[in-house]
Amino acid sequence: MTKPTKYRDVEIRAAHGNKLTAKSWLTEAPLRMLMNNLDPQVAENPKELVVYGGIGRAARNWECYDQIVESLTHLNDDETLLVQSGKPVGVFKTHSNAPRVLIANSNLVPHWASWEHFNELDAKGLAMYGQMTAGSWIYIGSQGIVQGTYETFVEAGRQHYDSNLKGRWVLTAGLGGMGGAQPLAATLAGACSLNIECQQVSIDFRLNSRYVDEQATDLDDALARIAKYTQEGKAISIALLGNAAEILPELVKRGVRPDMVTDQTSAHDPLNGYLPAGWTWDEYRARAKTEPAAVIKAAKQSMAVHVKAMLAFQKQGIPTFDYGNNIRQMAQEEGVENAFDFPGFVPAYIRPLFCRGVGPFRWAALSGDPQDIYKTDAKVKELIPDDAHLHNWLDMARERISFQGLPARICWVGLGQRAKLGLAFNEMVRSGELSAPVVIGRDHLDSGSVASPNRETEAMQDGSDAVSDWPLLNALLNTASGATWVSLHHGGGVGMGFSQHSGMVIVCDGTDEAAERIARVLHNDPATGVMRHADAGYQIAIDCAKEQGLNLPMIK
């Protein structure tokens, strides 16, 4: 048997314009979005099929990628392609309102749901880590998480600093696909930020895409810049090459006091995503292949040091929170018993939004024309006229966010609003106002599509943190409702054994049939989030369910 190819020296970019390369827009859309995930402007390591988040891939290997492209190119509108951990395994006759693609990535029976077992399967070519939007083909670059991070910083500013972050600064680490959103989000929220990153290539990526403003030469230079900009009231983001497990303890030792502390290193994956203190990146990658157990141990020991420093900041009264990378869990496993003393960002700042089905609604212009996104921005403002916060976000996004690959936009909207926007976008395609169809999707990090006790479902008030029926129901309902492609993943964000989550994407191609599917999917999808939180007893969700007329049999 020929060994599967994990590396290919090639550049992939999605087709642009309104000329089809597949049989219809329902199959052209997943084809373009798969390719867009691997665009060198989008992906972290596209030649190895890695999109973001350590080893989050778009396809299992290059042979699988080629066959997915082949299958989508010839897929009919009454057929469905099944993808198992990045490998196309079957094409079946279904019907025109069924999904064109159904994806299951990284799922393991719970007893075996560990990194150790997954890595064995991955080495044998039997599995693929799909992260959240890598293996579900709806990653749009760091913009995909910018607004969620922005909303978090804004809410933290409201709670701790009277809604004013001017002259304040955020300390964090990690400038990968997810963490790369932090510096821009902090700037948009009005704060300075110091962003520690151990790879110069990641810093360069964020500098080139304008997600980070400057790079300091060393820690002293970084602190001098922070002092200058905070005194001047300027919101400037600063990158610093270094290891967080070394720099945070040094900051504690020096008595430096940030105004907010968080982290977005790839701590969820100690073998591939977190550089042990004192190691070079080349050493880390080489030893990961020859002595993985020792590498994992060293990475987790460094995480323990990192978390102890974060706890020290919290003890000083500095707002400190986990941003969903499972670093607290890793530190606790290394003996830091009080690792969970600082909260996760969802229970601390975001859950009230989830209770109303508000979450990361995103869309991409398959035309490749930025004007299509600017026109949809205007439509969002027209249809949601009274939300000044949303309008401000859209204005800032247009000014500051560079498109990566196919032009795309994200904004957090909820139940009722998503369907209204989707139907309007479909009408814009029908009328020719948009030059080609758009796709609408979301992160798996949403109100009803994830079970993750150390992140999205941390500290649920009824204790249902680990109940994972909800993302399964979300995926089933999106399939029944007619989403264009639906995905069900395990381990995204926080790593193997710690999460299950689902995603959906729907195509707006301007047809009546699309409008019917959009109305169902973009209502039902956020409605499951309201349902899930109402079931857990959150009054905000119960009130929203009643206002929106949801039929929840056990909610009176």
UniProtKB/Swiss-Prot annotation:
GO molecular function terms listed in the Swiss-Prot or TrEMBL record: urocanate hydratase activity
Single GO biological process annotation from the record: L-histidine catabolic process to glutamate and formate
Naturally occurring in which organism (per UniProt): Pseudomonas fluorescens (strain SBW25)
Stored InterPro entries: Urocanase, Urocanase-like, Urocanase_C, Urocanase_central_sf, Urocanase_CS, Urocanase_N, Urocanase_Rossmann-like, Urocanase_sf
Any one of the GO CC terms: cytoplasm
Organism classification: Bacteria, Pseudomonadati, Pseudomonadota, Gammaproteobacteria, Pseudomonadales
Name of the gene encoding the protein in the UniProt record: hutU
Keywords, comma-separated and alphabetical: Cytoplasm, Histidine metabolism, Lyase, NAD
Pathway(s) annotated for this protein in UniProt: Amino-acid degradation; L-histidine degradation into L-glutamate; N-formimidoyl-L-glutamate from L-histidine: step 2/3
Catalytically driven reaction(s): 4-imidazolone-5-propanoate = trans-urocanate + H2O
HAMAP family, alphabetized: HutU
Cofactor note: Binds 1 NAD(+) per subunit.
Function: Catalyzes the conversion of urocanate to 4-imidazolone-5-propionate.
Superkingdom to which the source organism belongs: Bacteria
Protein name: Urocanate hydratase
Binding site for NAD(+): 53-54, 131, 177-179, 197, 243-244, 264-268, 274-275, 323, 493
Family the UniProt entry places it in: Belongs to the urocanase family.
